[in-house]
UniProtKB/Swiss-Prot annotation:
InterPro entries: DNA_Topoisomerase_II, DTHCT, HATPase_C_sf, Ribosomal_Su5_D2-typ_SF, Ribsml_uS5_D2-typ_fold_subgr, Topo_IIA, Topo_IIA-like_dom_sf, Topo_IIA_A/C_ab. Residues 341-343, 989-998 are annotated as: Interaction with DNA. Residues 1255-1265, 1486-1497 have a biased composition (Basic and acidic residues). Keywords: Acetylation, ATP-binding, Biological rhythms, Cytoplasm, DNA-binding, Isomerase, Isopeptide bond, Magnesium, Metal-binding, Nucleotide-binding, Nucleus, Phosphoprotein, Topoisomerase, Ubl conjugation. This is DNA topoisomerase 2-alpha. Residues 714-1166 form the Topo IIA-type catalytic domain.
Length: 1526
């Protein structure tokens, strides 16, 4: 059966031929407006259906036999490419219909113009269509507008969509054959169409029993495409499509011309594109691959040619991409943008599309019923919500994407763009005159043809510029210009683009010299483009001056390394010491050289010495002398090779932190060895020095700055002080003020007496910080804060001006630093003046009491505060030969808890309680979370809401004092219930973390040492301190022996004179001395002993007199002035008896001392210190209670005042929780730290290998099976003095003078505060400001420990026995004890430290006794060796504060290190709570007061029955947010 639907087309063509003949004849309406059939329309307007049928030339991905898949220019006909693709996609679609399909065979025969595509799998049904009355294969391949894809309710993931595909191929072929077999219908169908589907051949039907298959064979009508044959380009495109199908269709083998294509999946297919492609560094591109789910597969790599994509939708190659590509790319871009912004802080702003331009993405997707913008299906337009699936890329993929080179590529592009901006804005060209830099004194020849002979002198500040200008009077202004620097310039190696662009100093130097970014100054001609041929650096001869030189060298080396090879840089040195005698004068340019001269000059004391601390010390006359001898003072920097580059990079590159550590470690060790061997220090500037290599400068001069930076920033293990703090202490000891002194005046005194060379403002802040005592500052303030020294409201920033506040030494300070030890210390000398010692030697390690924090070069230090009494007790244990007990961080007057998560990992918890279903009360904030900051950054956003989060609370009220915290917060019931579920501590940000993995301190020999645990610090200190007690005893024995001998001689002399055995009247002096020697009298014993010690007792004797003749040499021979100078009234009976008594007492004192060991001396000092500590604490408490309710006064008003300030007794305390996740995170941090240290090869400090850290951790875990918890509270009679945290940021260690809460608080359920949780002492100096926005710089002066004492409670008379000494939990012998007990026990003191009578106390019979072992982190704070045992107080304030449910009475301990502790039980806790709530509801509302916030303490002053919980309490957990400061 033959049809001829093309007849009208042929007639139309004939009509067109006659057109010329009928040109003049008017066209009829019928010939103008014509109707065509669908088939006619397709042939007449093929571009509507298959794209252009004209040859086009464009860049395409093709497959060439010799190179594989490549991107090249091809000439092809899009229409022909499309009809081939339609058949190929149909074959691939069959995989979605029949998952068992496994093979596609493609045959392309250009010679015979024949293309065949065969696939197995379910075939086309060989059955007659009952409606159309023809077989289905004939229907769908030979009839237009037929398809199986018209049911849009059916979700399909196939390429076919509109019903045109295969028919279009038929129409544009001269011959088109369909062959399909159906196992289901047991038939094989075959039919051929000819002449552009114009004629249909006979249909063949045969019986069939094999597997289904379909084969389409066609011969394209090349004439329609204006082609003669299938050329190389179109075949290359078709072959690539065969590879596409092999890569995008899973589990299908594709054969091309009988050969199987070597593609094993999408990942393998992607590699074909990336073969031989390299990144910017010459390495193969990294590919990130993920099979997200069965419908999505993504690969990503870096692109150097803008955004590139290869994508498939249901096997269709979407060469123009579409929304499926955007959907995936946008996810990746959003993540990469965040990373780039973090790494490019301050650089050129990077936008999303710029990040996308560096990506090459491969996407293979199956999408339900996709839509396209044309029949060519190059761009997929379906919206993402209709994809039928999602593609959520995993964190693993994103992490790999960040590391695959894209981020580096973007950052390189950013640098390139930044460079363009720098060149545009910051580079300079050569001009004769420079405008806009007023402080520049330009050389007259700068910018002229003689510019290479000009030198620019860069000076340290305006005063140095004045010196240089004075000197220019000698050398002239033609060749020398001067420009003053304002302090230290930027480290450009680590600076951001924005910093460099905005740095006026850098830009001025570039402009003055005429430098251009990225220009190479290798040859001499390039130097002629500069306005100056050299830069001369003129700074002070101190370490800060060396740093400025180093920064300038770094600036030139980083941007123009070639300039260093031309000797472009030089320095101008000035003397640091001058000595003169008569008219002779010598200058020294380094202190070691001066010391050498002194040691080789016997009469050096006769020379006048003048020290030059800066350029400003030199006079104009001296400046002219310097410039007149330019050869001596000008030192050129000489480039000696790659070692110079390496040295500069070592000093200033951020990436070489570990190398710098090793560099400084070697320096400190070398310096130590030189001291031990008595060798002089190495120095650079000798009399003959004319040049210097950069390597020498870095390793011999700049390293002194880096070391001094550490010395200024990191305290000593011995006294816990930094040099500035030590100078303050030295001055206070020397002044020994009995009256208070203004801080500003004391600062001036310190600068004078201790030779302090920096600004007095920083000195005043150091003094203030040493005196601060608020919660979170010092546990023991060494100075007294007399005036406003700052509070916890603002973290100390609210201190008054130093002109208005006073201070003086704390009465405890000289007990900590006994004067008897001063003689054993090594004092330093500055400008020939004796100043502070290299360290003091306190009786307890102050670095643990007040903590430490600082950031130096290569190292940083972070140590929390610890409890004073715990430290004292541990020292006593060491003195007794016992092992010290573990300690948790502790902050004076802090009422919250600190818990240990892992070794050196802690979490700090504030206090929150629930008052009723809509009200909570916050009564403590984590350490260093200041009240005002918390209000502004946490509560205000919760009250007002933000753009992203709705309001959480409805109102809050504040009842703080300067020492206490109290927020009463209102919420809806629903919000409060939800907050309880999440955890109130977490919601209200009342947990912060503390990491102590950087306990780095200077040891006693001046070397940095890293400590793994706090007990390592304690043991190091103990060994050294014990040795110095031995030295003290030795010194005292000598001194007492000399004094005893002196008194003995004096008494004997007086007695013999009275008896007439010695006659001194009217005798020559020489004869008298002879008589005394004959009678066996000693020459002055005290003077002789002091001379033997080679130490001069008084500072004044160390100071040289300006008068050269004052060096009087002591008379040779014995001296008896101590006898002969005695007054006559010594001969009286009274004075004689007194002298004999003194002699006997001194002998007794000497004998007593001989019988004491160094340990005895130490224990005595500790006993005296603890006794005075209790006096001071009692006074602090008394001072704080001034104005609070007492015995007199109006009780009601006072109670009302208390109710506002103190925590409500009704509150149900929320127990902070530590989740397993928090512990796991802490362990992960430790593992990560150890791993990073091992990988980076950080040098071990002082022989402590990193492996030992792990061993210590394991050892500690065995030793402390349970997690340790410490509830910080202070007992009323003898508070456990919480180790006051030293302001780690400041130069001073502030001491918390107030050790206890100043007010008594009625008990409430919350008050098992002390025992409520097994709080582990955890605090993270890294993340003290999880939410607070205080910036790190200000924190330098403001880090202080928080108040560690809970509110005191008023207790009825019957409970007023003196409380037990602060009890801390004993070491647990049960590793699982933490998990077993729902109610944490309060820490108790070790059995050994308890007074005998307290150990016999038994628990109340009405209370359930639940024995629990807890890790002993705290030790008895009051009953200590060497102090008098005190009676056990009954229910003191502290007792109630710590245990509102009843005094916790310790069960007698079985072992020293394991103490069983009674667990509180509370059968009625819930009912009690209900009663309390009802009381609140019933209480009368005061005038003008919102009842919601009213808690009347009048009704609740009597404590409720004290009991623990019977039920397991609700636990409120907060995860720690960990931000590392360092």
């Amino acid at each position: 059966m033959e049809l001829s639907p093309l007849q009208p087309v042929n007639e139309n063509m004939q009509m067109n031929k006659k057109k010329n003949e009928d040109a003049k004849k008017r066209l009829s309406i019928e010939r103008i407006y014509q109707k065509k059939t669908q088939l006619e329309h397709i042939l007449l307007r093929p571009d509507t259906y298959i794209g252009s049928v004209e040859l086009v030339t464009q860049q395409m991905w093709v497959y060439d036999e010799d190179v594989g898949i490549n991107y090249r220019e091809v000439t092809f006909v899009p229409g022909l490419y499309k009809i081939f693709d339609e058949i190929l996609v149909n074959a691939a679609d069959n995989k979605q219909r029949d998952p068992k399909m496994s093979c596609i065979r493609v045959t392309i025969d250009p010679e015979n113009n024949l293309i065949s595509i065969w696939n197995n799998g379910k075939g086309i049904p060989v059955v007659e269509h009952k409606v159309e009355k023809m077989y289905v294969p004939a229907l769908i391949f030979g009839q237009l507008l037929t398809s199986s894809n018209y049911d849009d309710d059916e979700k399909k993931v196939t390429g076919g969509r509109n019903g045109y595909g295969a028919k279009l191929c038929n129409i544009f072929s001269t011959r088109f054959t369909v062959e399909t077999a159906s196992k289901e219908y047991k038939k094989m169908f075959k039919q051929t169409w000819m002449d552009n589907m114009g004629r249909a051949g006979d249909m063949e039907l045969k019986p069939f029993n094999g597997e289904d298959y379909t084969c389409i064979t066609f011969q394209p009508d090349l004439s329609k495409f204006k082609m003669q044959s299938l050329d190389k380009d179109i075949v290359a495109l078709m072959v690539r499509r065969a590879y596409d199908i092999a890569g995008s269709t899973k589990d299908v083998k594709v054969f091309l011309n009988g050969n199987k294509l070597p593609v094993k999946g999408f990942r393998s297919y992607v590699d074909m594109y990336l073969k031989d492609k390299l990144d910017e560094t010459g390495n193969a591109l990294k590919v990130v691959h993920e099979q997200v789910n069965p419908r999505w597969e993504v690969c990503l790599t870096m692109s150097e040619k803008g955004f590139q994509q290869i994508s498939f939708v249901n096997s269709i190659a979407t060469s123009k991409g579409g929304r499926h590509v955007d959907y995936v790319a946008d996810q990746i871009v959003s993540k990469l943008v965040d990373v780039v912004k973090k790494k490019n802080k301050g650089g050129v702003a990077v936008k999303a599309h710029q990040v996308k331009n560096h990506m090459w993405i491969f996407v293979n997707a199956l999408i339900e019923n996709p839509t396209f913008d044309s029949q060519t299906k190059e761009n997929m337009t379906l919206q993402a919500k209709s994809f039928g699936s999602t593609c959520q890329l995993s964190e693993k993929f994103i992490k790999a994407a960040i590391g695959c080179g894209i981020v580096e590529s973007i950052l390189n592009w950013v640098k390139f763009k930044a460079q363009i901006q720098l060149n545009k804005k910051c580079s300079a060209v050569k001009h004769n005159r420079i405008k806009g830099i007023p402080k520049l004194d330009d050389a007259n020849d700068a910018g002229s043809r003689n510019s290479t002979e000009c030198t620019l002198i860069l000076t340290e500040g305006d005063s140095a510029k004045t010196l240089a200008v004075s000197g220019l009077g000698v050398v002239g202004r033609d060749k020398y210009g001067v420009f003053p620097l304002r302090g230290k310039i930027l480290n450009v190696r680590e600076a951001s683009h924005k910093q460099i662009m905005e740095n006026a100093e850098i830009n001025n130097i570039i402009k003055i010299v005429g430098l251009q970014y990225k220009k190479n100054y290798e040859d001499e001609d390039s130097l002629k483009t500069l306005r100056y041929g050299k830069i001369m650096i003129m700074t002070d001869q101190d370490q800060d001056g060396s740093h400025i030189k180093g920064l300038l060298i770094n600036f030139i080396h980083h941007n123009w390394p070639s300039l260093l090879r031309h000797r472009f840089l030089e320095e101008f040195i000035t003397p640091i010491v001058k000595v003169s005698k008569n008219k002779q004068e010598l200058a020294f340019y380094s202190l070691p050289e001066f010391e050498e001269w002194k040691s080789s000059t016997p009469n050096h004391k006769k020379w006048k010495v003048k020290y030059y601390k800066g350029l400003g010390t030199s006079t104009s006359k001296e400046a002219k002398e310097y410039f007149a001898d330019m050869k001596r003072h000008r030192i050129q920097f000489k480039y000696s090779g790659p070692e110079d580059d390496a040295a500069i990079s070592l000093a200033f590159s951020k990436k070489q932190v570990d190398d710098r550590k090793e560099w400084l470690t070697h320096f400190m060790e070398d310096r130590r060895q030189r001291k031990l061997l008595g060798l002089p220090e190495d120095y650079l500037y000798g009399q003959t020095t004319t040049y210097l290599t950069y390597n020498d400068f870095i390793n011999k001069e700049l390293i002194l700055f880096s070391n001094s930076d550490n010395e200024r920033s990191i305290p000593s293990m011995v006294d816990g002080l930094k040099p500035g703090q030590r100078k303050v202490l030295f001055t206070c000891f020397k002044r020994n003020d009995k009256r208070e002194v203004k801080v500003a005046q004391l600062a001036g005194s310190v600068a004078e007496m201790s030779s302090y060379h920096h600004g007095e403002m920083s000195l005043m802040m150091t003094i203030i910080n040493l005196a601060q005592n608020f919660v979170g500052s010092n546990n023991l303030n060494l100075l007294q804060p007399i005036g406003q020294f700052g509070t916890r409201l603002h973290g100390g920033k609210d201190s008054a001006s130093p002109r208005y506040i006073f201070t003086m030494l704390s009465p405890l300070t000289r007990l900590l630093f006994p004067p008897k030890d001063d003689h054993t210390l090594k004092f330093l000398y500055d400008d020939n003046q004796r100043v502070e010692p290299e360290w003091y030697i306190p009786i307890i390690p102050m670095v643990l009491i007040n903590g430490a924090e600082g950031i130096g070069t290569g190292w940083s230090c972070k140590i929390p505060n610890f409890d004073i009494r715990e430290v004292v007790n541990n020292i006593r244990r060491l003195l007794d030969g016992e092992e010290p007990l573990p300690m948790l961080p502790s902050y004076k007057n802090f009422k919250g808890t600190i818990e240990e998560l892992a070794s050196n990992q802690y979490v700090i918890n504030g206090e929150v309680a629930i008052l009723n279903s809509t009200t909570i009360e916050i009564s403590e904030l984590p350490i260093r979370t200041w009240t005002q900051t918390y209000k502004e950054q946490v509560l205000e956003p919760m009250l007002n809401g933000t753009e992203k989060t709705p309001p959480l609370i409805t109102d809050y009220r504040e009842y703080h004092t300067d020492t206490t915290v109290k927020f009463v917060i209102k919420m809806t019931e629903e919000k409060l219930a939800e907050a309880e579920r999440v955890g109130l501590h977490k919601v209200f940000k009342l947990q912060t973390s503390l990491t102590c993995n950087s306990m780095v301190l200077f040891d006693h020999v001046g070397c940095l040492k890293k400590y793994d645990t706090v007990l390592d610090i304690l043991k190091d200190f103990f060994e050294l301190r014990l040795k110095y007690y031995g030295l003290r005893k030795e010194w005292l024995l000598g001194m007492l022996g000399a004094e005893s001998a002196k008194l003995n001689n004096q008494a004997r002399f007086i007695l013999e004179k009275i008896d007439g055995k010695i006659i001194i009247e009217n005798k020559p002096k020489k004869e008298l001395i002879k008589v005394l020697i004959q009678r066996g009298y000693d020459s002055d014993p005290v003077k002789a002993w002091k001379e033997a010690q080679q130490k001069v007792p008084d500072e004044e004797e160390n100071e040289e007199s300006d008068n050269e003749n004052s060096d009087s040499v002591a008379e040779s021979g014995p001296t008896f002035n101590y006898l002969l100078d005695m007054p006559l009234w010594y001969l009286t009976k009274e004075k004689k008896d007194e002298l004999c008594k003194q002699r006997n007492e001194k002998e007794q004192e000497l004998n007593t001392l001989k019988n004491k060991s160094p340990s005895d001396l130490w224990k005595e000092d500790l006993a005296v210190f603890i006794e005075e500590l209790e006096v001071v604490e009692a006074k602090e408490k008394q001072d704080e209670q001034v104005g609070l309710p007492g015995k007199g006064g109006k009780a009601k008003g006072k109670k009302a005042q208390m109710s506002e300030v103190l925590p409500s007794p009704h509150g149900k305390r929320v127990i902070p929780q530590v989740t397993m996740e928090m512990k796991a995170e802490a362990e992960k941090k430790i593992r990560k730290k150890i791993k990073s240290e091992n990988v980076e090869g950080t040098p071990t400090e002082n022989g402590l290998e990193l492996g030992s850290l792990k061993q210590r951790i394991e050892k500690k875990q065995k030793k402390e099976p349970g997690a340790m918890t410490k509830k910080q509270t202070t007992l009323a009679f003898k508070p456990i003095k919480k180790g006051k945290k030293r302001n780690p940021w400041s130069d001073s260690e502030s001491d918390m003078s107030s050790n206890e809460s100043n007010v008594d608080v009625p008990p409430r359920e919350k008050d098992p505060r002390r025992a409520a949780t097994k709080a582990k002492f955890t605090m993270d100096l890294d993340s003290d400001e999880d939410f607070s926005g205080s910036d790190g710089k200000d924190e330098d002066e403001d880090f202080f420990p928080l108040d560690t004492t809970p509110p005191k409670t008023k207790i009825p008379q019957k409970n007023t026995k003196k409380a037990l000494k602060p009890q801390k939990s004993a070491m647990s012998g049960d590793p699982e004890s933490d998990e077993k007990d729902s109610v944490p026990a309060s820490p108790g003191p070790p059995a050994a430290d308890l007074p005998a009578d307290t150990e016999q106390l038994k628990p109340s019979s009405k209370q359930t006794v639940a024995v629990k072992k807890t890790a002993t982190k705290s030790q008895s704070s009051t009953s200590t060796a060497g102090t008098k045992k005190r009676a056990v107080p009954k229910g003191s304030k502290s007792d109630s504060a710590l245990n509102a449910h009843g005094p916790e009475k310790p069960v007698p301990a079985k072992a020293k290190n394991s103490r069983k502790r009674k667990q509180s039980s509370s059968d009625d806790s819930d009912s009690d709570f209900e009663k309390v709530v009802s009381k609140v509801a019933a209480s009368k509302k005061s005038k003008g007061e919102n009842q919601d916030f009213r808690v009347d303490l009048d009704e609740t002053m009597v404590p409720r029955a004290k009991s623990g919980r019977a039920k397991k309490p609700i636990k409120y957990l907060e995860e720690s947010d960990d931000d590392d400061l360092f």
